[in-house]
């Protein structure tokens, strides 16, 4: 399970990339304050499509306790998200980690409503982080 704020930029991008890099896994995503039922942001979709990943078939969804319980691993973009999930779902604290853990605990900032350059940087960070995680499975 991959988490960000709105589930329209970072987490769906990471979901699509990690699923492509580790097809043996069941990868999903959700948002802490999701833009429920919205598609992936057009700038995030453009980055995915440009780099050969699918941006299709995404509908943002809200994180809830059931999703957390069902997940074997929960990857977040920023430390504050990790703290929040550990506070809100204390039983899951052992399985909540940064997506950027293997990149010196890199935090991946939210590109929402920012430039295409910001989306390109975030895409690069997410792709590198997903590659690092895929090598662990």
Q: Where are the language model's segments positioned?
A:
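Phosphate-binding/catalytic loops
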Residues: 73, 79-137
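Conserved active-site segments centered on acidic
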Residues: 1-70, 135
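Short beta-strand scaffold positions
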Residues: 2, 76-77
């Amino acid at each position: 399970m991959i988490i960000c704020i709105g589930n329209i930029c970072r987490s769906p991008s990471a979901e699509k990339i990690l699923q492509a890099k580790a097809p043996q896994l069941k990868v999903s995503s959700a948002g802490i304050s999701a833009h429920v039922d919205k598609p992936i942001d057009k700038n995030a979709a453009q980055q995915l499509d440009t780099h050969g990943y699918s941006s299709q078939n995404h509908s943002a969804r809200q994180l809830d306790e059931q999703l957390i319980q069902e997940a074997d691993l929960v990857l977040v973009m920023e430390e504050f998200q990790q703290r929040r999930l550990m506070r809100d779902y204390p039983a899951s604290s052992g399985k909540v980690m940064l997506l950027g853990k293997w990149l010196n605990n890199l935090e991946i900032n939210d590109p929402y409503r920012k430039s295409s350059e910001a989306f390109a940087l975030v895409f690069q960070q997410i792709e590198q982080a997903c590659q690092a995680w895929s090598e662990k499975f």
